[in-house]
Every structure is written in structure tokens, then in C-alpha cells.
Amino acid sequence: MTKTKAFLQKHRWSLTGALLGALVFLVLYGVRVLDPVCVDWILNNPSPDPSQHYLGWVFYRRSGWHLPYLGANYSAIYPYRTSILYTDSIPLLAVVCKLLGGVLPACFQYLGLWGLFCYAMQGGLAQALIARIGGVRPQDTGKNWASVLGAGVLVLFPALHIRMFAHTALAANWLVLLALWVWLCAEQSENRPSTGKLCLWWGVLGLLCAGIHLYYLPMVGMVLVATCVQRGLEKRGPAAVVLPIVSFCAVALAELFVLGAFAANFAGYSNGYLSGADLANLFVPGLGASWEQEVYAGLGTTAAVVLALAGLLVQRKKAAEFFRRHTHIVVAAVVLLILDAVASMGNTVTFGGRTLFTVPIPQVLMDFWAMFSSCARLAWLAGMLLAVAACGLVLRFWNGAAAAVLLAVCAAAQGFGLRTELTKRYTTYHDAAYYEDTTQLTDPAWEQLAASGQFSRLAFASFDFEHDDFWDLVAFAADHGWTSNSFYMGHMDGNLAAVTLAGEMNTLAPDTLYAFIDEDELARSDYALHYYRLDGILLGSVEPIHGLTEEPAVDIPAHTMALQKSSVINGTADADTVTLNEGGELLTEAWMLFPGSYRVTLTGSGFDHSYIYARHGLINQETYKMEVNFTGIAPDEMVFEFSTGEPLYYWRTAVHALNDTPIAVTVIKVEKIG
């Protein structure tokens, strides 16, 4: 009891910051997300990522242990080995929860509690950092309350909110703050820790980063490099500079090996491109070339930086003395910002929305760098460093109550700048309908299938995780302990997955329920299966399914393409019609077609002023324009046929407008005629 009281007394201000973070979380998301057996809100998210995180954990939980790969998952893309790492299911938590699987409920999610933990850690660590930079003593109540207000800037850091329950593992912004805290604790403490203790600390950070999300490895790694730069400037000796880096890298690599990062099938590792940051975007919103490249640090961060600079100018002598006493750590911080700028920009340098230049780099370096292809995320490090440093300097160089008022204004400004996102999250997560079961699999026959014991595996005929039915089917398989032959993975080689799934259809198994989604229905005549339809989904089975009525065979399988999924240039598209103007182009959604002969019929108007063709080709590989035979040519209908002796991956039809005559496309129907 005495030790607990002493701990609470010593860390009361950091715990207050953590409480602030937790309260913000509860206000935004409510308490229902904390219920470990409530999962519908995860599956109802319009993005596939939360479903990936949760169902990845469920499949992993039901997959057996396979040493030495504790993170191996054989259930998600059966019979191949994947890793819990590539479903972004917070691997460390997944492994721990799998070990405790015998005492956990059958339906269990940890994402809600993880979110609460992230917000609390963000607030607690932010307060501790701001207080330390601000030179605040534990007994200085006024300034400590000011540091808690400053922590509000970090609790409202944009990346934390935007990633929470979207890319949930990436919401661990607190890992960067923890690394900064370890740095300051080690370098400003009167009793500096030994090199061995530093190796232990940074080894733990390597363990956390590799076990939560890979993008934190370079961010925290750069903080480590900065600490070693400082130690080098202070001439601590080679061991003090090198060994913490060795410890961090060795622990992270060992953990990645155990998690199966290097032994996963379908892992592409590198996307082959870089999505870099516009560094002006740290202070100016909307400059990111895409949502993924938006790195805005918030209005409150900008305000804090301006106020910190003003304080330094007003108290120039005090500031000069402060920087003189901390020269080495300031130099190391500048090195850190430069490193982060280079890493986050990629090889194409943009500033203020304008591309300045592109640096050619060797392919070997590109392949390594592109493992972190969304490298703009690395700029979060600079944003958080500037935020905590600025808030700390405001606390140090503005007097008394003024600092508290200014930091409160900064926190309020941070929230005001995020008001649209915060309101959206509050509205979404406080809507009772968001927690309802909205699966499209409502036919009672689904549960009969699960209870029959006839099936233990689900197999998709082709690789398409973007279809609505896909996630309902995968959730059904995961909930009932079945395996699936298809899943959405990070860094996945989609080409290999597409080719593999098509090949698996050559060997049919009686314990497998086959799902034919969209264009896959065209191939139904190719396989000696018994076919059934539940909730509009075509299912196939080697053996008859007792209690279900088989769907009659069709003479010519046909399916219509979804026009609203088309890519349209110089035109408009909705569910019914695509209209092309002068120079317009329509490119349909991508399908996988099995070997055979096909007829494609386009209905609409103005086709006598168009150019129509079909193409196919794997992602980032050569695209092949097909030889087709037009059997019907009219202004309101175009028909062409073709044959293929092998599967066609990412097959599409294109329509180009040749002049200023408008072209309307109302239906594109594909038939398998042989």
C-alpha cells in the first residue's frame, strides 16, 4: 500500500495527463468499444482495415502453434503460412491473448482497450516530456497543471485520431513519445544510466515497435540515432554510441523472425514506390498529395511553435544560456529533424504543394526504402517532436499564469482545427446502429451449414477482398473455426495471391465450401460442383448439402459489370449510366476470368464515335491488349467475343470517346459461351 501511494505521488502529474487522454477517448468513442465481446462496430466500419485487424486476430487465434514462428497464421490463407504481423493486428497483443485463449471468451476483441491505452499513454508521456523540457519541478503545482494543458495538444494530435480504429496499430504515437522520454531521461539525469541499462531500454523499445507496427521502427530508430549523436559529441566512447543501436536492431530483428515476418507466403515486402510528405504540410493543412500523405501536425502545434519562438526572442539572454548548457542535445535534435525530413519526403522533394526535384536512387535502396512506401507517416516524428518541444519552451520562457493560458489556447486551437474529424467520430461511435449486426448473411441455412460439420474450410474462386460479400463470408468462416483461402494482408503480393487462388480450383475438396462472387459465377459450368444460393451468393460443394435446394444449371452464365466501380476520365458515372464527353475514357472494374470463350455486350448510345477494347495484366506488370472479334456493331450496342486458354487477371474493358459526341454506357454484360 505504501509503495503504491509513493508511486502515485511521484507520478501524479503524468497520471493526470494520462487521465486527460483517457477522458478524451471516452468522450469521442464512448464505452461500448471497450466491451471485449462487442465486435459488430469493428465489422461495420466502412474501411476494410478494422475488419482485417480483428479477423486476422481471430484466424490467428484458431491457428495452431508452429515453432519457431509464434506469429505464424495458417488459417487466414489456408494452406499457406502468413504472419499476424501482416494483418496489423497488434502482434504483441495477439500473441499474449492467444496464450490466454483458454480463459478468454470465444468472441473477443482487444482493439477498444488498445485505443484507450493509446490515448492514456499519449497524455501521460506528453505531460512528462513537456514538464521536463519546461524545467518544471514536481512541487510546482501551477506549472504542472500548465504541462497537463500542453499535453492536450498531443492528445489531440491529428495522426492519433485519424488512425484510431482505421489503422489501429498505427495509432501508437506514444511509442515516439516514449523514445523521446527515454532519450531525455538518459541524457538529463544526474545519475546517467550505464550503457548496459540503455541497451536494455532501447531493446525494449525495439521489441515494442516490431511487435506493434513496423513503421515505428524507423521513427524510434531515428530518435535512437539522435541519442547516439549526442553521446558521440560528449565523447562517451564507442560502446556507448554503438551498443544501444545494436541492441535495438537485434531485438527487433529477432522478434520479427519469431513473428514469421521473413517466412510468410504472399509477402511482397516492397511496394516499389514512395509516397512522401510535403514538409510544409506539417503547418499548412491540405498539402498532402493524398489522404495517406497528409501529415498536418495541427493548429495547436503551429500556435505552440510560434509562441515558443516569441518567448525565445523576448528572453534572448535566458534562451542563449539555455541552449549553451544543452548544446549537444540541441545539435542532436537538429540532426533528428534532418534525418526525419529526408526519410519522410522520399526521393521526390515537394514543398508548399510544388514538386521541386526528384533524386534518382539505386534500385536496391529503393526496394529497401519502399518497404515503408507510405514514408510520409515518418513525418509524424517531426510533428510530435516540435509539439512537445514547443509546449515545453512556452512553459520555460513564458512567465507564470501566462504559460498556462497560452498552452490552454494551444490545446483549444488543436481541437478546433480537428473539429470536423472529432465531430464525425463522436457521431459515429455514439450511434446505437453502429453496434448492430449488419451482416448480409441472414439466411438460417448458414448456421445449419456451420453446425453440420460437413465443412471446415471456405474457398473463394478468385482474389477480391474489396467486395462487400467477401468480409461477411470471411467473418462467418472465422467465427465458426473454418479456414479461408483468401484474406487481405499488408505488404501482400496480390499478383501471387490471384494466380494461386485460381490454381487451387483445379483440386476440389469435400470439406470445402466454395464461394463464387460476382464474375466468378461465369465459371460455374467449369466445375463438377453442386450449386446453391444463399443471400444472393453462389456456393459450390463437392457433395450435396442436406436440406438445401440446388440451383438449376444455366445454359450461358452471364454477369453484369458494376458501372459505378469504373474509372472515368472526362465524364460522369453512377449506378445506371456512364457518360463520356470529348476525350472521355471509361475503364471498367477489374475481373478475373477463367479459361474459356466469352461474349461482351455494351449497351448505350454513341458507340459509332468510340473506340472499344479489352485488356488484362497483373499489377505493376505489362498490360496486354486483347485480340477480340466484334460480332455486333451499332450505335446503341457493341458486341465482341474472345477466347483464352489461361486465366485472365485484372481483365477490363475500355471505352474511349473519339470526338465531342457524347457517349452513354448503360450496361456491360459478360457471358461465358464456352
Where are these regions (language model features)?
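Transmembrane alpha-helices of multi-pass, membrane-embedded glycan-processing enzymes
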Residues: 49, 97-101, 114-125, 172-175, ...
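Periplasmic/ER-lumenal interhelical loops and adjacent helix-loop junctions
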Residues: 47-48, 249-313, 552, 558-559
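Extracytoplasmic
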Residues: 418-560
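Membrane-interface helix-loop junctions at the exits of transmembrane helices
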Residues: 27-33, 65-68, 149-166, 253-264, ...
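Start-transfer (signal-anchor) and selected internal transmembrane alpha helices
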Residues: 1-39, 243-244, 320-336
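Membrane-interface coil-to-helix junctions
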Residues: 25-121, 157, 167
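Signature aromatic-anchored transmembrane alpha helix within multi-pass, membrane-resident enzymes
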Residues: 138-144, 225, 245-249, 388, ...
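Membrane-embedded helix bundles of polyisoprenyl
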Residues: 116-133, 143-187, 195-231, 244-251, ...
